[in-house]
Amino acid sequence: MAMKGDGKSISFVEDTAVAPEKLRDFIDKFLEIIHRHGTTAGIYAHASVGCLHVRPVVNMKTSAGVKQFESIANEVANLVLEFGGALSGEHGDGLVRGPFMERMFGTELYEGFRTIKRTFDPGGLFNPGKIVDSPPLTSNLRYGSDYQTPTPLAEFDHTEHGGLGRAVEMCSGVGACRKTLSGTMCPSYMVTRDEAHSTRGRANTLRLAMTGALDFNDPRDAGLGDRTVYDVLDLCLECRACKTECPVGVDMARFKSEFLSDYWTRHGTPLRARILGHIHDLSSVGHQLANVVNPLLSQRWFRTLNEYLLGIDHRRSLPTWAPVTLSDQWVNDSENEAPNTPRVTLFRDTFTQYYDPNIGLAAADVLRSAGFTVGLGPNVCCGRPLISQGLLAKARQRAEQTESYLLPTATAGQPIILLEPSCLSSLVDDIPSLLSGTAQQHAKTCLLYTSPSPRD
């Protein structure tokens, strides 16, 4: 399903089922249809009950692809009848298989379906077009021969997918982001149960916005500037669960960063984004005033002001600055370094440096106990706050600075140990996409503290 480019493995004949003893011959003839149409297919699922999911690869952006789609569907429907099977083994009929229901069940039974439908729903209000009186197979296509993939300007490198537009189109609509009982994707959908706040809903909204299919009241809103898109993306936590759990690896966190970058350009960057994006620099300043600021953080009036200015709920406790930073407590062990002792560099993230240095000190102790000499990295930010807030031009500048500091360590082949997963994600995934060339080199040397030992 995770195919790049315009040809996609799509679901329209994916639920056929026959008696298990007939499955081999059925699939052989099914694949003959696929190959005769000059394409391939993905196959998976439940062979033991005679229901293999076959998803042909079709480019629905061309008239030839649409004809191919319709022809395959018709031939497969006839094949199912030949083998005495079912066109819908477990997924239901809906719009995509509705046009074949009379062929599958016969005119008499089909008219019985219609009678029941008209008796209980004379106005056709409930799920119109499903099962009976369905529109033509090609009448509700997401794409079509007149569809043009949008090519919006992007800050990240989306060359792998053929641009930002095609990266958004990677969403296949399978709906794994709508699960509620397992995994992490998608936390906002798990809470709201609203399609708009699922990864699929957001991908569809972005696609519609980029193709001009949304109604815009303000000329500034055309494309990715629409407030509707902002509202749909607002609850995205940028946790990147979709990047790992989505079958096609949709990276909604990156799309949100791209959107915010464009949106701020059109509408102005709010104070909240500026402050949270520059939290590394502000933490350095705040540390100098820790004795004054720390007592304020627990004051109700200060929290209320914080909620008004930054949107941080007044009930949320705020981290306090440590009296002494990690770097001020660090003891450099290079002077006592034994010959041939493997050396690692501990990345000095913002939180560990200014708020909880004990985490960094404890990690260093563990690494030393494991036989490593530990050096402390420079006081640079991974760029995650800027990226998350959509300040991508600033993020690129920060990435260049961070890259210049980390490159000597990376060139020496020295592992860089990180304590924060979000920092690792930024250094390994985002910075190489914002930059080019040597950024790939430092990415290969970064390891999360909970990863296997660098020796491994």
Question: Where are the model-predicted features located?
Answer:
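Short, hydrophobic beta-strand segments
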Residues: 4-16, 52-62, 96-103, 344-349
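Short, conserved phosphate-binding/catalytic loop or strand-edge motifs used
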Residues: 48-53, 92-98, 380-383
